């Protein structure tokens, strides 16, 4: 441990072996709170490399139980969170709609830290059992193409280190790891990050982890694709990483103000979700979710481009099938 700390104090990247050793010790609670705080802060100041992030994620996955084997190329759109802008749950609503369109969504997430409502909070408030056992999860997924994996059930180190991390008052490597440690190991990911400087690092980490297709985004300071500002994107495709910017015109959608996406409490997020699924949501809410669903369809080769993905999603919403789909998820999650 002393060698690892000294390397970080001198702002040196850790070797793969050192990262694996460090996170194995963290998993087994062999690192004191003082040491863990020092390590997280030193990593933050140095700047986490994509290798450190990917090896840490691999180590955590090696110790996480896999609930079932689907045999499919699963999709996740879990983001880092941490943008502090308190918007509606764009990615969670997008995952519900995408799964109602037949995409195999394995949604990894947790409760809110910086927002009014995290993915777990929203789903729980909608009536979904967020702590499904493996049998329930597999059954729900097989019948709805949607499964929610509540991160603390699979990664105890996240749960146990949460109080310490909260006291640091800063984002750490754990924010980066959250979207990378889905126990079902999705091969397609739409990953939002809280800072655009992380886009390339996270794209490289996804590539190192063996993800086939991905888009890492930061839109107007949020960890989502947005319509109110430019969305910076790094796309992983055919083992290459492409960098580009997106705006509302790329989706053939009008721009909306960020303020229209912000909410005051968790109940507002629940109502926004229900309204969107029933095709009666505010245009500003619906269209930003549609842009994110379109991106999932594009990454999954279900739409040839983003504009086609938008058209497909808007037509699907008219049927109100996503609302019926949610009711099925709720029922099966408790079965």
Curated annotation (Swiss-Prot):
Name of this chain's protein: Anthranilate phosphoribosyltransferase
Ranges that cross the membrane: none
Binding-site positions, 5-phospho-alpha-D-ribose 1-diphosphate: 79, 82-83, 87, 89-92, 107-115, 119
NCBIfam families according to UniProt: trpD
Protein source organism: Helicobacter pylori (strain P12)
Annotated positions binding Mg(2+) 2: 223-224
MF GO annotations: anthranilate phosphoribosyltransferase activity; magnesium ion binding
Assembly mode: Homodimer.
GO cellular component assignments: cytosol
Protein family: Belongs to the anthranilate phosphoribosyltransferase family.
Chemical reaction(s) catalysed: N-(5-phospho-beta-D-ribosyl)anthranilate + diphosphate = 5-phospho-alpha-D-ribose 1-diphosphate + anthranilate
Keyword Lipid metabolism: no
